[in-house]
Amino acid sequence: RFIVEFDALTCLVQHEYYHRYTADVHTLNAIRELDRIYTEAEPITLKYRAALHETTDSSLLYLTLLLHDIGKAEGIRGHSDSGVRLATPLLERFGVKPADRELVLFVIKNHLAMARFWQKRDVDDPQTAAAFAELVGNAEQLRNLYVHTFCDARGTAVSLWNSYKDTLHTSLYRATLERLSLGDGVAASYEKKKQMTQQELIARKILGVSAEEIA
């Protein structure tokens, strides 16, 4: 046995209503979703494949997905934090280099964060991207979290992931990536786009809507 810590997930029932599988089967399903990104031509997977190609080592996501729910052995509450604690010595035992270890542990700790952001916040608000950029820190961690969230959700139940959720998820990803790339320049870019949109609407002279209302 290479990962004795995984034993506690075997046949572990997850009582949240959206979970259809035991923790061990869910983990394997999530890994299978990552395989599909590489091997299938399903349109929804193409942007995730592109994001993977931009990562330093896309194979690390297999390890991250394998370990992301390992903390559930100690209970669902706080399982992200307990997962980090359990995974840390395991990664050291496997000889994973420090930089890669840090990346894997970051995603384990924050593997629920991205979905919560786009579920609870306006992804079109620049402040949402700014706040998420502050959380993820850099593009490498963002790309890994972006793909991981997709695989994790589809590994729970493919039917739970629809085009609406995918649009919100990808909108947050792209806005955050832009924020990380341009920094404070994003605010100026957003304001410029806003002004251009306002000018276009004013030029159309929409019946019953004044220029002041548009502005």
What are the residue ranges of the model-derived segments?
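Acidic/His-rich, divalent-metal-binding segments that scaffold phosphate/diphosphate chemistry
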Residues: 1-79, 89, 95
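Short acidic (Asp/Glu) and glycine-rich catalytic loops that position anionic groups and cofactors
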Residues: 5-13, 62-67, 82-88, 111-112, ...
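Hydrophobic alpha-helical scaffolding
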Residues: 16-23, 56, 60, 73-77, ...
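Divalent metal-coordination and catalytic microenvironments
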Residues: 30, 83, 108
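Short, well-ordered loop/turn and helix-capping segments at boundaries between secondary-structure elements
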Residues: 36, 72, 76, 89-96, ...
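Amphipathic alpha-helical segments in well-structured domains
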Residues: 80-87, 101, 105
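Acidic/histidine-rich catalytic neighborhood
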Residues: 92-150
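Regulatory modules associated with amino-acid/nitrogen control
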Residues: 127, 131-215
